[in-house]
């Protein structure tokens, strides 16, 4: 079972109406049985509808989807979108994490996680949750630390230990420095395995930053992970794209992992 998190820069109608870009996005996403797409800027779900039409071009049931409401503290909103193959997994439940009072200024996240619980008959772990996060870069340390609270909430709500937390955490370079990791519970607690190392480069730009991460908790989920399968997918190299074309698709690579 192949899972990925992909921050597709400004994913919306403009990008999906470009035949070249949309065909590469579909080609990338078809690698996966579950894909989280972040930075979905699509208030009326027009781009999401087009994406699903394209993914299901050959078979109307290749992919289904779950999408969050538009999330954000001001007029700038993003959605979390999951596309998945229903012949491999099914959605058991979803909920929007409540991170506090936005208007009071004491909420924990710019885009609070929209959590999904999947059933997966073909893997060792039969049910697991995915917690998505696209952090606000300037608050990355605090937001990644707050994912620990989301983990506890999911664990309690669904009586579930097998939880994957993933997305563009902005977890490197100037946003999270080496001295700050010690203040991040998601990192210091032995409950969690960080599958994408700090040395990884998840950016399609000239920077070398491990912004995008996959973190797993729960013994069944951790034992289902195929050893070295957690890597960024460098679509530029894989498809022989120019820098310009790669960046037109996104400034991030997907991060992926395989479960058995």
UniProtKB/Swiss-Prot annotation:
The record marks 13, 67 as: Involved in actin-binding. Disulfide bonds join 101-104, 173-209. The active site is at 78, 134. GO terms for cellular component: extracellular region; nuclear envelope; zymogen granule. It catalyses: Endonucleolytic cleavage to 5'-phosphodinucleotide and 5'-phosphooligonucleotide end-products. Its main location: secreted. Pfam families: Exo_endo_phos. It is found in: Secreted; Zymogen granule; Nucleus envelope. Gene3D superfamilies: Endonuclease/exonuclease/phosphatase (3.60.10.10). Keywords: Actin-binding, Apoptosis, Calcium, Cytoplasmic vesicle, Disulfide bond, Endonuclease, Glycoprotein, Hydrolase, Nuclease, Nucleus, Secreted. Glycans are attached at residue 18. InterPro entries: Deoxyribonuclease-1_AS, DNase_I, DNASE_I_2, Endo/exonu/phosph_ase_sf, Endo/exonuclease/phosphatase. This is Deoxyribonuclease-1. GO terms for molecular function: actin binding; deoxyribonuclease I activity; DNA binding. Its EC number is 3.1.21.1. Its cofactor is Ca(2+); Mg(2+). Divalent metal cations. Prefers Ca(2+) or Mg(2+). It is an enzyme of class 3 (hydrolase). Belongs to the DNase I family. It comes from the Eukaryota. SUPFAM superfamilies: DNase I-like (SSF56219).
